[in-house]
Amino acid sequence: MKTIGIIGGMGPMATVDLMQKIILATDACEDQDHIPILVDNNTNIPDRTAAILGQGTSPVPELLKSAERLTAQGADFLIMGCNTAHFFLPLLMPYLKIPFISMIETTAEFCKQQGLQKVGLLASAGTCHSGIYQRALQHVGIEILLPTKAGETAIHNMIYAGVKAGKQHYDTTDVQKTLQDMCRAGAEAFILGCTEIPLAVSLYALEGNFLDATQILAEKAVTAAGAKVIRKLPISKTVLSTEISTY
């Protein structure tokens, strides 16, 4: 069985969430059936959104340090749970010595398998402005809907003032309005395109048809490591948050 290397710390809770989803997605009867996982919880990685918006330091040097440490420790391939960090992947790839599985491409391919034609993106401002999901979905022939500026701000605040701040309760009225507006615009499902958003779905009981990019990546990683997935994500028009985010 291959060893998974997780470039983590973006943020720490999201890193734990990805690792937990890998463990829960693995068909295992005993400890020895589980996949070896190495995690570099590098909290020195600068904020990715700030870097994309030209307001902060590039995360590339620290991302590369994490990749090198994981490679040296024996990882067979790399993943990272931070959607926004994938914007910098082209700058990392020339220096990586082992394969990297992209959360963005994996999620886009999953949307295609479901037969979706139009999806909404719930993500940080950095991810929305980076164009990473727009390019990946366009490549597989799927239209993407982005939140309005007000919706983007509401989602950003929920991520930073809610989940990252460790708040167990948070007023999501503006976020729920954003979901309703995007549904009216034709969104068949929503990609949870920031690693904190699946946590927000669970913590703050958001309602909608959600595609958890973290869960999709976790199941892809399980397969790539040579283990069996205990339960495949459903291939249907919509995937409810309870089906993806809570098992």
Q: What is the meaning of each model-derived region?
A:
Residues 1-247:
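Non-catalytic structural scaffold of enzyme domains
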